[in-house]
Design a protein with these regions (language model features):
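Often metal-dependent polyanion-binding catalytic scaffolds in large enzymes
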Residues: 1-441, 459, 698, 705, ...
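Glycine- and acidic
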Residues: 1-4, 21, 58, 194-209, ...
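Generic, well-ordered alpha-helical scaffold segments in large soluble proteins
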Residues: 18-22, 38-41, 79, 215, ...
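Structured alpha-helical segments in the cores of large, soluble enzyme domains
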Residues: 119-122, 146, 162, 167-192, ...
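Beta-sheet entry/capping signal
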Residues: 255-257, 261-263, 271, 396-397, ...
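Catalytic or ion-translocation cores adjacent to nucleophile or general acid/base/metal-coordination motifs
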Residues: 274-303, 506-692
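Active-site cores of enzymes that catalyze phosphoryl transfer or operate on phosphate-rich substrates
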Residues: 335, 339, 345-346, 404-497, ...
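C-terminal accessory/interaction regions of large nucleic acid-associated machines
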Residues: 708-897
Length: 897
């Protein structure tokens, strides 16, 4: 359905007007006029880059003191966040209008997937739904730049704008709602937008759970109901494989085709702030949250279920269950629930058992399976009426999806510390080569456990304690507590085997002692990150599959191997196209290898928010995966920066979930065809040329690290309290040691977005243009590459980026010419392939939305350049407003990294 510009423009204009009112009240009319004058100059410069407005804008910024620039930055940043809210409300409006107009299935919807697979036998469609296993893993983005307090104010604006959108609202109520908006905007304006301290892991845990509590917990039942009704099959079908649910980690009664995980509080990779205590505290918080959410809904259901005994059918099983509860929980009282209200009586016992489970008291539920069994007894008694398909079915969906843990905690550690710890436990390990290490590990895993004194090395002790926390978590909370143990920078079989050894070494027995001799059944997931590691993944996994102790561990974990693919570091290592093609080829080889050995494999895609980190719409990305690589099973990271974009409202959360799951259904039932050899040859050439071009600049030109540090706020990021994890690995200062996220963040800030496109122009220019157009039309993978390039080019801005050259050394400035030429080259080729005069001409609604933000982002960029110069010259007053420009540009670009 085409976008309705009038409603989006109306909302944006309203929010601009209301913010202007607040600025007048708080800072005076002259300040408001200054802010909007800067916006108008930026808009005029966009319309005519040769106009004098650019110099006027720069001179106006230079005339203002650093202290005076601070409030200007705040105003632009708040308006950009308000514009984002207006865009999200427009998405919601379009979804509702589409449903009301009944104009056929919406693009990327479950209904569209059902229509596309209508010719497939119902039995196959039912089996595809039974096989669905979609894991969405939330991460605490290290550069997620929105404070919790600001997030809360954004939610209030969202709700008030939604009320204003109701056509039944009259003039009096409208004025009252606008006054409420002014009040919220006033408090927002008076709130610091930069944290007073760097967030701790527990802050990130709370923020991650907030998205579940406020949106996802109630959106999931709606989505699952839509999934069943649209595809015409039941999620209660007993053909679901053993252990399905929560991304394949739970053996609960019933199942959910989607499951949620989290890295917040469990990601130890390079983060000294996460350790065994953090893991334990995080899971305790997860459990408390899960039981509270379930308890609140059971209490509400008990109030609602007031049916009298003589007016409903009550199964003998339910009556027996109530009698059993009365014997086991004799002290439970029934305020307002009489003996002739069996459903309410049962739900009172359910609430009591949940409360006891939360308190660790006698009589509480041992696990969520027991709760589900009780709810199923209630639903069976309601089976003859519509009551069975309402609130109780919603509660069952929530119990099956979120369980007693809300989201399984993933634990991640880098291969280096794991190997270092193992070397302190196995004699001769440190000096052995890879073959020798594998031999030592197989011997240690095959024989009985032996006592090894705790090492004196502090790093080794810390790593061992972190792995021990995994075993304790499973013992304390059950297998659903830990989603997976991820090995970052995995390169060789010993990286996985040493992790298995450490799991076994620290495994607790029923008394809490270690050395039980059997590692907990926690999936060990290698994360292949660089281009070279992706190429070597097949050999690594082949050796592991052939290793008896690991094969046994795999069987105890359900017989399925999960492999994580790193988009961020592979792109930093080899450039955009080399990363994408390397990931594609690795999946093809790993699927063929697993199929040959009868092993089921699921890929965990570590996508970021930006294009250069694999970001973009899930639907398109899933459909571009190699044939046979999905088969109903996939896991995807949901970066902290994108959670509020994908799940800002329950209805939009349903839309995001259906876009993801519908793509999995389509990729399973109608997989893409294997690309012909001429396509492969073309991609091989593109990869080789683009990687050589990219690395020649990024890794081989000694001036490049200075360009990165001088022409971006990379150094200043370390002072900004926007993540619990350091920006660099170890103490290195070059590109190699820089984490992929701040690497991308820096190029997003200076508007160049270099990692997303550099090298691709040279490669594409040398290719066959007719073949490239054919590939765009006939190959989803290449079509996605071109679409992502087009988006990145549109978001980049060489005119703004060139302003940052004022900050660099003279010899470094010489790098600008090849960068500018490559940008022009790739843009020219993309337009030739697309056959359009301008970028994003085929998606005018998106083009208009992105362009609409620029007049508010551009002043921030000019101010950032001025403040970077002043800060580096020693102006202490520049630091605060400078950090605010970082958050404002991130909000406007809708990406941090």
């Amino acid at each position: 359905m085409p976008e309705t510009p009038s409603t989006l423009d109306r909302d944006t204009a309203l929010l601009e007007r209301l913010l202007g009112d607040v600025l007048v009240e708080q800072e005076g009319p002259a300040f408001r006029d200054r802010v909007f004058w800067l916006r108008e100059r930026a808009a005029a410069l966009r319309a005519d880059p040769s106009a004098p407005d650019g110099d006027e804008l720069v001179q106006a910024v230079r005339r203002l003191s650093s202290s005076d620039l601070g409030p200007v930055v705040r105003a632009c940043s708040v308006q950009l966040q308000l514009s984002n809210i207006a865009e999200e409300l427009e998405r919601l409006r379009r979804r509702r209008a589409h449903d009301a107009d009944d104009q056929g299935p919406q693009r990327e919807s479950l209904a569209a997937a059902a229509a596309a697979t209508a010719g497939i036998p119902q039995s196959r469609r039912a089996q595809a739904l039974a096989d669905l296993d979609v894991g969405l893993v939330m991460t605490a983005h290290p550069t997620e730049a929105t404070r919790r307090s600001i997030f809360d104010h954004q939610q209030r604006v969202w709700a008030l704008m939604e009320h204003l959108d109701d056509p039944r609202v009259g003039p009096t109520r409208r004025r009252a709602l606008e006054d409420e908006l002014r009040e919220v905007l006033t408090v927002w304006w008076q709130t610091d937008d930069v944290r007073a301290r760097r967030p701790r892991p527990d802050d990130e845990v709370r923020r991650t759970l907030l998205h579940v509590e406020s949106v996802l917990y109630d959106a999931v039942p709606d989505f699952l109901a839509e999934l069943e009704s649209t595809l015409g099959v039941s999620l209660d079908d007993d053909r679901a494989p053993e252990g399905k649910g929560r991304g394949g980690r739970s053996g609960r009664v019933g199942r959910s085709p989607i499951g949620f995980g989290s890295w917040a509080g469990g990601d130890m990779d390079g983060n000294p702030n996460v350790g065994p205590e953090t893991i334990a505290e995080t899971l305790n918080r997860h459990r408390r949250t899960a039981l509270r959410l379930l308890g609140e809904r059971v209490d509400a259901l008990a109030v609602f279920f007031s049916q009298a005994d003589d007016r409903v059918f009550v199964t003998q099983e339910l009556r027996a269950s109530i009698e059993r509860d009365e014997r086991q929980l004799p002290r439970v009282t029934f305020p307002g629930a009489s003996a002739n209200e069996p459903f309410r009586r049962k739900l009172t016992f359910v609430a009591a058992r949940l409360d006891r489970a939360a308190q660790g008291g006698e009589g509480g539920y041992a696990g969520v399976d027991e709760l589900i069994a009780d709810l199923e007894l209630l639903r069976a008694s309601c089976s003859s009426s519509r009551v069975a398909h309402g609130r109780i079915t919603r509660l069952l969906a929530q119990a099956r999806t979120f369980g007693f843990i809300v989201a399984a905690l993933d634990v991640r550690q880098s291969a280096g510390p794991l190997q270092h710890a193992t070397a302190h436990l196995i004699e001769g390990y440190a000096d052995a080569d890879e073959a020798g290490r594998q031999e030592l590990l197989v011997a240690a895993l095959s024989g009985p456990p032996s006592y090894v004194p705790e090492p004196e090395d502090e790093e080794a002790r810390s790593t061992i304690a972190g792995i021990a926390a995994v075993g304790r978590a499973v013992a304390d909370h059950g297998p659903e507590a830990i989603g997976r143990l991820i090995i970052a920078m995995a390169r060789q079989p010993s990286d996985v085997l040493c992790t298995q050894f450490l799991l076994r070494h620290t495994a607790p027995d029923e008394h809490g002692a270690t050395m039980r001799g059997v590692a907990p059944a926690v999936p060990i997931v290698p994360l292949f990150e660089t281009v070279d590691d992706l190429e070597g993944a097949e050999a690594t996994m082949g050796d592991l599959y052939a290793t008896a102790p690991y094969a046994e561990h795999l069987q105890r974990c359900g017989g399925s191997q999960e492999i994580m693919l790193g988009y961020s570091d592979s792109a930093k290592d080899g450039g955009f196209i080399a990363s994408q093609w390397g990931l594609y080829g690795a999946q093809e080889r790993l699927v063929a290898q697993a199929d040959a050995q009868g092993i089921s494999v699921r890929f965990f895609h570590g996508r970021g928010g930006s294009t250069s980190r694999g970001g973009g719409p899930h639907h398109r990305a899933i459909l571009s995966q190699p044939p046979g690589s999905v088969r109903g099973r996939i896991a995807i990271t949901e970066q902290g920066e994108t959670l509020s974009q994908r799940y800002p409202h329950p209805e939009l959360a349903v839309r995001s979930l259906e876009q993801t799951v519908s793509a999995v259904v389509l990729a399973t039932l109608t997989p893409a065809e294997t690309p012909p050899d001429r396509y492969r040859s073309a991609l091989d050439d593109l990869t080789r040329i683009s990687r050589e071009t990219y690395r020649a600049l990024v890794f081989e030109d000694e001036r490049f690290p200075r360009l990165l540090h001088q022409a971006s706020p990379l150094a200043e990021l370390s002072a900004m309290n926007i993540g619990s994890r350091p920006a660099k690995r170890g103490g290195t200062t070059g590109v190699d040691g820089l984490r992929a996220i701040p690497w991308v963040f820096s190029w997003m800030q200076n508007r160049l977005l270099l990692p997303a496109w550099y090298g691709t122009g040279t490669a594409l220019e040398q290719g066959d243009r007719d073949l490239q157009r054919e590939m765009v039309e006939g190959w989803p993978f290449f079509r996605t590459i071109v679409s992502m390039l087009e988006m990145s080019l549109f978001k980049s801005d060489l005119g703004v980026a060139e302003r940052y050259l004022e900050l660099v050394d003279d010899d470094v400035r010489a790098l600008w010419e090849p960068i500018r030429a490559e940008h022009e080259r790739v843009q020219s080729v993309v337009l030739e392939i697309r056959g359009t005069p301008e970028l994003l001409d085929r998606t005018p609604a998106l083009q208009r939305r992105l362009a609409h933000r620029n007049p508010w982002i551009d002043p921030l960029s000019h101010i950032q350049v001025a403040l970077l110069r002043r800060s580096r010259e020693g102006d202490e007053n520049a630091q605060g407003p400078l950090l605010s420009t970082i958050g404002g540009i991130a909000a406007g670009m809708r990406n941090t990294g």
